[in-house]
Structure formats: structure tokens, C-alpha cells
UniProtKB/Swiss-Prot annotation:
Stretches for region Disordered: 56-82
Keywords annotated in UniProt: Cytoplasm, Developmental protein, Nucleus, Proteasome
Disruption phenotype: Embryonic lethality, growth defects, larval arrest, reduced lifespan, and sterility.
Family affiliation: Belongs to the DSS1/SEM1 family.
GO CC aspect terms: cytoplasm; nucleus; proteasome complex; proteasome regulatory particle, lid subcomplex
Assembly and oligomerization: Part of the 26S proteasome.
Function: Subunit of the 26S proteasome which plays a role in ubiquitin-dependent proteolysis. Has an essential role in oogenesis and larval growth. Required for intestinal function and default lifespan.
Tissue: Expressed in intestinal epithelium and head neurons.
Protein name: Probable 26S proteasome complex subunit dss-1
Lineage: Eukaryota, Metazoa, Ecdysozoa, Nematoda, Chromadorea
Domain of life: Eukaryota
């Protein structure tokens, strides 16, 4: 095999440079950058007991319209409802 034939094989199997650059640009655009969030430092003695949701689950009405309809349908179909 001559040296020009070997060069042709190398050139034909090489990935075009533009394809590599385009791929890199796509990968960089794939992820969205988010700004850094600054959190306030806690003061000494600040309580760790922070309530982030309501603890009064028992205060909710257990006899909502939905639960009444569900119990009625269960009774109609022969199920025992407490």
C-alpha cells in the first residue's frame, strides 16, 4: 500500500472537526445554569425546631362530601363500612 493510499484511509475514517465542535456546543447548551442561592446564616441560639407544615391533621373534617359518597357507594355494593 502506498503512502497516499494510507493517507486517504486516515482522512476518510477521521471525524470532521466541525462535527466535534457542534457536538460540544450542544452538550454545553444541554444543561441550564442556575444562579447561586445565598442563604442567611443562622444566629447563635436560634432554634432548630422549625415547623414547615401543619401538625393539625386531626383537625380536618373526616366527614367530607367525598367520604360520605364513598361510604354510601360501599354500603350499596354490600361492603361493611365502619
Amino acid at each position: 500500500m502506498s503512502s497516499t493510499a494510507a493517507k486517504k484511509d486516515v482522512k476518510s475514517s477521521a471525524v470532521p472537526v466541525t462535527a466535534v465542535v457542534e457536538k460540544k456546543e450542544f452538550e454545553e447548551e444541554e444543561f441550564e445554569e442556575f444562579p447561586v442561592q445565598e442563604w442567611a446564616e443562622r444566629a447563635e441560639g436560634e432554634e432548630d425546631d422549625v415547623n414547615v407544615w401543619e401538625d393539625n391533621w386531626d383537625d380536618e373534617t373526616h366527614e367530607s362530601e367525598f367520604s360520605k359518597q364513598l361510604k354510601e357507594e360501599l354500603r350499596k355494593s354490600g361492603h361493611q363500612v365502619a
